Amino acid sequence: MAITRRQFLRRSAIAVAAASLNQSQLSGAVRTIVLSSPARKVLILGAGMAGLVAAYELTKLGHDVTVLEARTRPGGRVHTLREPFSDGLFAEEGAARIPENHDLTHKYVKEFALPLEPFYPSRLNALRFDHGGREEVPIDGFTDAMTQHYGYDLGGTPTRWTKIKGGSDVLPRAFAERLGTKIHYGSPVVKIEQDQKQARVVFLNAGKQQTMTADNILCTIPFSVLRNVDLAGLSSRKREIIQNTRYDAVARVYLQTRNRVWEDKGLNGFAFTAGAVEIWQPTWNQPGPRGILMTYARPGEAERITKLKENERIATTLKQLGDMFGGLRDSFERGATKCWLDDEWSRGAWAFVGFGNFGAAIAPEGRIHFAGEHLSEWSSWMQGALSSGLRAVKEIDEFVTVQAKV
């Protein structure tokens, strides 16, 4: 199976650094780790997918785990938008699709007995816009055009991609339910330090500064946010990488309509342009007459949208989609937007650490370990966050074993 250039570079960096596991090892990592020393206290920074899976597996291994999360919810960039929509409709702010070859994502979906459903509809036609032309195509033609445009295998056959019934954030909430009070929400980190005996984190909770100590720390905070934390416990090389890692913009605009007027024209609400924008209809298999069309703008177009005020984003998108689908303006009820550069606890959608820096970026420093989609070959996917979290579980368990022998 073909891989992306980005995945090739990341995999090469992992091999050179000898600081990670290959994908087949990651798939079995949880089954091969055995607690071989007394349980240690592990402090995990961030309750996104990497932090959650690490906390879940370390807890099963018998370690004493605490998670600090700045937000008031789990999931990080896996979040389902339900407000301000009517009739229980929803759409995704972040991760939405599960390619068929993302084995770790499927593993935990199955473990938590979460139902899946197709991401793309098999009926009606999608739209393809290319060099000024407009063409109606069946969904397989739509996904073929998308794959051709990006120039690489997107992860199996897109028409076989799935989504989690009820919303993507059902998965992080399943992790969080099992971790319970181990997660401390509303607790942003302000300082990370360590010495030969322990690691320490200073954080805020209810406006008051507090300190926690641990045998090991797993930091899953995006580098775009971590660069604003006092990193006294890290090397100058690591701090330089954190400071210079680039995060891309992604912007999404959602339009709720009274009726799914596009279906009257034989369209399923999905469209692909030759530029940096996809159009999805996440409500195609949600009940009721109302629907949501959403634009998914990637770097380039996303920065332009982010600079607009929210009402301008909605108005501009309504005009664009109205021209594409027709009849949309009369059916429009309300809109919403999500621009990840503006998100206080993400400051971007996904990261590019860079080939020359990747080995140093993923390497632990003393008692402090690192994980997240930004430190994975599967950048921007739930699969990436999960795989990096499991890598960190392996690292921490090995660290504990070594320490026990000293």
What kind of feature is each model-predicted range?
Residues 76-160:
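Active-site-adjacent segment of FAD-dependent monooxygenases/related oxidoreductases
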Residues 59-81:
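Glycine-rich FAD pyrophosphate-binding loop
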Residues 41-67:
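N-terminal Rossmann-like FAD-binding beta1-loop-alpha1 element of flavoenzymes
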Residues 219-236:
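Flavin (primarily FAD) binding-site architecture
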Residues 11, 20, 53, 61, ...:
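Conserved flavin/dinucleotide-binding core of flavoenzymes
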Residues 45, 212-224:
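Short hydrophobic core segments
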Residues 1-16:
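N-terminal secretory signal peptides and thylakoid transit peptides that target proteins
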Residues 155-208, 215:
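Helical element adjacent to the flavin cofactor pocket in flavoenzyme catalytic cores
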